[in-house]
A protein has these predicted regions:
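Short aromatic/hydrophobic contact patches that present stacked aromatics
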Residues: 7-9, 46, 69-71, 107-109
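Short amphipathic alpha-helices in soluble, non-transmembrane regions
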Residues: 22, 26, 83-88
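Short, conserved charged micro-motifs
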Residues: 16-19, 78-83
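Vicinal oxygen chelate
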Residues: 1-3, 90-128
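N-terminal beta-strand motif that seeds the catalytic metal site of vicinal oxygen chelate
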Residues: 1-21, 70, 126-128
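Short acidic/glycine-enriched loop/turn segments that link adjacent beta-strands
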Residues: 39-43, 64, 101-106
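Core segments of cupin and vicinal oxygen chelate
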Residues: 11-53
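A short linear hydrophobic-aromatic micro-motif
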Residues: 32-34, 55-56, 92-97
Length: 128
């Protein structure tokens, strides 16, 4: 039986490693983890997200995922707004869906350096 989620992979073009580290590591604050030796030559980068992982993998014929996306849970509404400000300060567009769509949840959408959609989510009391 399934007991959890191990990792999510997003695709990126060849040569993506430094941009992956700058975006997912520095900007979003994820911890980079070492790829297994047999996989390191394929490029990309891996990051820890609590007890799960985000894998940025090199894809031949890359095209961004504009609908499918990872959704990262953040600790608070204040953290969500801080990350929104950081994304915007670095030139990334941020959109904020209506809280009415999922009551009790604040969300924002943005894109990584290659146009893959990402979502950031914070739980809040309904109506705030």
């Amino acid at each position: 039986m399934i007991v959890g989620l191990d990792h999510v992979q997003v695709a990126a073009p060849a040569g993506c490693e430094e941009d992956a580290r700058a975006f997912y590591g520095v900007l979003l604050g994820l911890e980079e983890i070492e790829k297994p030796a047999l996989l390191a030559s394929r490029g990309g980068a891996w990051f820890r997200v609590d007890d799960q992982q985000l894998h940025v993998g090199v894809a031949d014929g890359f095209g961004p995922a504009t609908k499918a996306h990872p959704a990262f849970r953040v600790s608070s509404a204040a953290s969500l707004e801080m990350l929104a400000a950081r994304l915007e300060a670095h030139g990334y567009a941020v959109s904020r869906p209506s809280q009415e769509e999922i009551p009790g949840t604040l969300r924002l959408h943005s894109s990584d350096p290659w146009g893959n959609r990402i979502e950031l989510v914070a739980d809040v009391p309904y109506g705030t």
